[in-house]
Amino acid sequence: MTSPTPLLSLRGIGKSYGPVVAVREVDLDIFPGEVVAICGDNGAGKSSLIKVISGAEEPSAGAISMRGKPVAFASPHDALDHGVATIYQDLALAPRLTIAQNVFMGSELTRPFLLPFLRVLDKKRMIAESQRYLSQLSAAVTDMTRPVERLSGGQRQAVAISRALRWNAEIIIMDEPTAALGVKESALVLDLIRKLKSDGRTVILISHNMRDVVALADRVVIMGAGRKYVDQPLGDLTADDLTHMIMAGNAKAA
């Protein structure tokens, strides 16, 4: 049987900041429709690796390919153009703008006004499209003119994910998506990620919350001292198992 082609492949990825080596020779394949959790203690190299995948940083060594074709991400826009979107912990939302304005920030829709060469914002279409994206996520948000600052933490995550859908992202990187959220809001975010998976999206999850990882991940990658030392299906692993694996990796790196 022919093995499926990875959606994203990293080969020999390294990242250095002067004399500091943050990522060391990482090989990683990400397949369509899976949730991959990247775990590790502080300083393990997770954030630096994600910055390379998201285009925020260029690798110091190694190669990236999408569906077997070499690519280079010199900026987050390059990554977006190839279908890779990142939702950071702070969500990068403008709190005083409306839901629709946030979903379409940087890619606003326009329509002709009076003369063919004059264009104005197509607010009605942006509201309708924003509602469609949020409905895809089964998010209980109905008023697209509502300022984001009036939303709950889970609802804000839904807006940030909708913006990634607006960019037609195939891979959505989520950095600590439940950090600082209560139990109810965390459950909402977990449901949003499950919905992304059921719709065929690929999610790369960075989390220190092993319970979230166990609840969501198909596969777990554990890093330590810049290296990938675990890459396996989640299977029957528990949150305690993952914690022990991270600690064991720290001991090896020490």
Give the residues covered by each predicted segment.
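Glycine-rich phosphate-binding loops of nucleotide-dependent enzymes
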Residues: 2-254
